[in-house]
Amino acid sequence: MAQHTIDQTQVIHTKPSALSYKEKTLVMGILNVTPDSFSDGGKYDSLDKALLHAKEMIDDGAHIIDIGGESTRPGAECVSEDEEMSRVIPVIERITKELGVPISVDTYKASVADEAVKAGASIINDIWGAKHDPKMASVAAEHNVPIVLMHNRPERNYNDLLPDMLSDLMESVKIAVEAGVDEKNIILDPGIGFAKTYHDNLAVMNKLEIFSGLGYPVLLATSRKRFIGRVLDLPPEERAEGTGATVCLGIQKGCDIVRVHDVKQIARMAKMMDAMLNKGGVHHG
């Protein structure tokens, strides 16, 4: 597959300021304002608690806060657009006003993404890669904001896992570009834990370099996921070390953004990996 040379500056065009992933791995801290997320459901569902947790994550090294109002865990309850908006919009407005940090909205609904960006979010993080809601790519294009296109599919009906994943992701890219999304605003996510078996997830982790080889920035979202729990035989809240191992491998294989719950530990690991890999061409310290 031909490599794209998208944006030599290696910048994600966020607000209030753009973020460079050339010299450091960007850490995206997860803020779930849901009652039923697999890892932290119900913990941050009040405005004050959500704001406090966002501030803690920024202090711990997060560059982006990813806010989600509907759990994406398998079997989670679907919520209406109105309910999702009522959860995320006040949090986005408050964090934008008080913390001034780039915010990502974790949604696959175009109407929610639209309102979230108007409220201050500057990245759309879509677990369906602009394939679930036909208006999603247009919303990203209209607002000229980055969009994370995650790999996903309704069934695990692969002929050949990795080539099929690349093909699926490039379909998402095509949808986005045809809707008017600037290629510099496209971020890819291999979708660890979505429509993949335990062995699929390990195989994808082992070949992450093929995704960074497409020429777009890559977001890796492995935090506390089930395949880590299966390897370590540990519950979600005890998977920070396992998550750290996946993040270190991901950074070595060219991932640019890591989406995590355990920001303090992972931000330190990312900084150490960046130094050892001489990311940005300047030795740290």
UniProtKB/Swiss-Prot annotation:
SUPFAM superfamilies: Dihydropteroate synthetase-like
InterPro entries for this protein: DHP_synth-like (IPR045031), DHP_synth_dom (IPR006390), Dihydropteroate_synth-like_sf (IPR011005), Pterin-binding_dom (IPR000489)
Gene3D superfamilies linked to this entry: Dihydropteroate synthase-like
Cofactor(s) essential for the protein: Mg(2+)
Binding positions ((7,8-dihydropterin-6-yl)methyl diphosphate): 72, 106, 125, 189, 225, 259-261
Family indicated by similarity: Belongs to the DHPS family.
Protein name per UniProt: Dihydropteroate synthase
Organism ancestry: Bacteria, Bacillati, Bacillota, Bacilli, Bacillales
